[in-house]
A protein has these predicted regions:
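Active-site neighborhoods of enzymes that stabilize oxyanions during catalysis
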Residues: 27-30, 145-216, 297-308
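Positively charged n-region of N-terminal signal peptides that target proteins for export
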Residues: 1-8
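Phosphate-coordinating loops and pocket residues in cytosolic domains that bind phosphorylated ligands
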Residues: 60, 150, 294
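Positively charged, proline/Ser/Thr-rich regional signature most characteristic
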Residues: 24-103, 111-113, 185-248, 252, ...
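Bacterial N-terminal signal peptides
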Residues: 9-19
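C-terminal soluble interaction/assembly domains
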Residues: 233, 243, 248-305
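Terminal peptide-recognition signature
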Residues: 33, 66, 130, 148, ...
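Thiolate-centered catalytic microenvironments shared by cysteine-dependent enzyme domains
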Residues: 88-181, 265-282, 287-288
Length: 308
């Protein structure tokens, strides 16, 4: 009886341990992220990635053990189009150099503040790239550095470099699509094309883009509607925005393709729908509007579309 009880307790202990460190993609509270960082168990210590573009921001202070991975190092000009995702071999080399590891949890963050601050998009873009290359244990720190500091958690100016990483053998490139697949899929009645940019860009009232408007058939859903007004790095609970999302026509039964200007805003909308709302089929058109505007054989429109 005692032996059987000991076996049961041991099994429960193992189950709890596995549950605490199980692989998943989603968000994590600052307190829980700090608990992982401070863990004495090397097997659960996370890879922490500070994705801010400004290196001086990293110098001013960052999460303990954070390795600075400027999000824009993962993009460059290709065929004359700026900020395209880099080729596979270069991207993989950069991720390995940053310590990305198939066997570890990855904590990703930027700063966070009111709009126009949009540094959460740096974090969601890096999370997208990691997921694309097969990493399945990724958490964005909810609220970013702003909330971390509000909760009086430790910040340091010490530098940290991760040891060489190791990527999974199999990638998940199906989470993104290229222009050819977009053109094939976008007119399917079960497909919903969603533009994650601000509404003024969607209807062409901006001074940014070579051509004005959006991809024909796309609806508008600005990514910031899913985030807290006083901190764009803080995710609103899905229950709080469920009706807003549904009323816009975004439902889990649809195949959803998101895009934006350069893919950062789209990466956030995809992350929320896929990993917070748990929609099963959400993909990102990686080229986004910056690529589409160069393809002048394909039309653009400025009239607003609604889901019927």
């Amino acid at each position: 009886m005692v032996v059987e009880m000991n076996r049961l307790l041991f099994a429960i202990f193992i189950w709890i341990g596995c549950t605490l460190v199980r692989a998943e993609i989603g968000i994590i509270s600052p307190a829980e992220a700090n608990r992982l960082i401070e863990s004495s168990d090397a097997s659960v210590k996370p890879i922490v990635l500070d994705t801010r573009g400004g290196y001086k921001d990293y110098f001013r202070g960052h999460l303990p053990t954070a390795h600075h991975l400027n999000f824009d190092t993962l993009r460059g000009t290709q065929n004359g189009i700026p900020v395209e995702y880099l080729p596979d071999d270069i991207t993989k080399a950069l991720l390995i150099r940053a310590g990305v590891n198939r066997d570890r949890t990855h904590l990703i963050y930027a700063t966070g503040d009111k709009l126009p601050n949009d540094e959460i998009l740096s974090a969601s873009m890096v999370a997208y790239v990691l997921e694309k290359y097969g990493v399945n244990d990724i958490r964005i720190v909810d609220g970013g550095l702003m909330k971390w500091q509000q909760e009086k958690l430790p910040v340091t100016q010490e530098y940290f470099g991760n040891p060489k990483g190791a990527l999974p053998k199999f990638d998940s490139k199906q989470i993104g699509i290229d222009i050819d697949e977009l053109l094939k899929r976008k007119n399917d009645p079960n497909v919903l094309l969603v533009d994650a940019r601000p509404y003024n860009e969607y209807i062409g009232q901006d001074d940014i883009w070579l051509r004005k408007g959006h991809i024909p058939g796309a609806i508008s859903f600005h990514w910031a509607r899913l985030m807290a007004k006083d901190n764009t790095h803080e995710f609103l609970p899905f229950e709080q925005v469920k009706m807003v999302v549904k009323d816009a026509g975004l439902t889990p039964e649809r195949e959803i393709i998101v895009y934006c200007g350069t893919s950062r805003e789209g990466s956030l909308l995809r992350f929320y729908l896929k990993h917070v709302a748990k929609f099963p089929n959400v993909r990102l058109y990686e080229g986004s509007w910056k690529e589409y505007v160069t393809l002048k054989q394909h039309p653009a429109e400025t009239l607003e579309n609604k889901v019927r």
